């Protein structure tokens, strides 16, 4: 099996099929000897900011000399982006090898795409003897496939807001409860969110509850944006709690190396910002960043999103009458149509069809979904 065949097999499982629950992945991992039990974890959940927190933590641990496994989702360009060891993606050869090997063993268990990837990740990291895994949840926490782990060094919970409400609940308290499912016995939970449920579940599990305030000095952090204050505070609190001997010099050196593509990322050659903000809270953070860093720029937006998102709220938050607005319908069965987007937009808009003259002095902002970025980047 080669890489393309592995991807084809994965997508045949239903690329956007989501079935929360731990029974299937538990049976699959048992057949492989439960490789997840051989590893140590920092487990990260939350609505927004998970990827940035994971990137900061893993980079600091790498700088301190550890062999660090990093598991994130979704990917932008290739599946291999999701599984990394010390900043290096799993090779396409290894990815195909593990997909082929594992799916033959568990072929009678109807795993989702995300569950297969999670099983591959556990087996790969165990085989490579990583020192620690920085583990990002896929959706929610309590019944997310990553929560098959029995213990963690600590749980980290980032900002909580409305997203995936059809699965996680319609109130912030319900969503927080689902995220709190990653809190394990005799461990710790580090969060910037003061929900009582976090402390209650921590107490029930004899685990430390640590509430941290935003860390304001992000001047050395390679990631841009006001919202990174909160992400940095969580990452640094986690490092200082678990690894107090990591020096300030190592931390500052690592912060300058952190990479997390398409998070308020500025592409100078095109005077363009690319941001995977894909829910109302993420769009609000993007809007705040644009108002703060580029208050007087003539802005041109390219926006597309999935139909399970509150795109009406995102559109109302983001756009102003003076903006140029372009909508993009990408190749995804759940992509919102141009007509649907235009129906809720209070301002004139057009369909994005071809690249612009990027020397015209306008700031182009691309946002709305992870899933359109690979396709759209080829047209920019």
Show which residues each predicted segment covers.
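C-terminal helical cap/extension that packs against the catalytic core
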Residues: 193-210, 225, 271-272, 312-365
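N-terminal pre-Walker A segment at the start of P-loop NTPase domains
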Residues: 12-26
């Amino acid at each position: 099996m080669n890489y393309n065949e592995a991807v084809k097999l994965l997508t045949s499982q239903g690329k956007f099929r989501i079935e929360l629950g731990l029974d299937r992945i538990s049976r699959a991992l048992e057949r492989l000897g439960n490789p997840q039990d051989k590893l140590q974890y920092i487990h990260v959940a939350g609505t927004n900011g998970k990827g940035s927190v994971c990137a900061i933590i893993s980079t600091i641990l790498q700088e301190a000399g550890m062999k660090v496994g990093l598991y994130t989702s979704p990917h932008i360009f290739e599946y291999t982006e999701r599984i990394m060891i010390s900043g290096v993606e799993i090779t396409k050869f290894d990815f195909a090898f593990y997909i082929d090997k594992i799916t033959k063993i568990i072929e009678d268990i109807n795993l989702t795409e995300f569950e297969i990837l999670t099983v591959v990740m556990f087996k790969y990291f165990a085989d490579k003897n990583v020192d620690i895994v920085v583990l990002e949840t896929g959706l929610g926490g309590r019944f997310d496939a990553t929560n098959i782990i029995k213990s963690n060094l600590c749980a980290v919970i980032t900002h909580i807001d409305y997203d995936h409400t059809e699965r996680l609940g319609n109130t912030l308290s319900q969503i927080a409860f689902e995220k709190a499912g990653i809190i394990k016995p005799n461990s710790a939970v580090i969060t910037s969110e003061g929900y009582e449920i976090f402390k209650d579940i921590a107490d029930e599990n004899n685990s430390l509850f640590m509430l941290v305030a935003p860390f304001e000095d992000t001047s050395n952090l390679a990631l841009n944006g006001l919202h990174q204050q909160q992400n940095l505070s969580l990452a640094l609190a986690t490092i200082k709690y678990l690894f107090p001997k990591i020096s300030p010099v190592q931390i500052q050196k690592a912060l300058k190396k952190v990479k997390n593509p398409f998070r308020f990322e500025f592409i100078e050659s095109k005077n363009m910002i690319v941001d995977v903000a894909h829910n109302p809270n993420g769009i609000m953070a993007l809007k705040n960043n644009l108002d703060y860093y580029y208050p007087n720029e003539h802005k041109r937006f390219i926006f597309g999103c999935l139909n399970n998102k509150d795109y009406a709220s995102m559109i109302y938050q983001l756009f102003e009458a003076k903006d140029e607005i372009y909508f993009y319908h990408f190749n995804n069965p759940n992509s919102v149509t141009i007509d649907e987007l235009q129906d809720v937009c209070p301002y004139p808009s057009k369909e994005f069809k071809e690249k612009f003259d990027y020397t015209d002095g306008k700031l182009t902002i691309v946002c709305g979904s992870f899933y359109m970025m690979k396709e759209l980047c080829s047209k920019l």
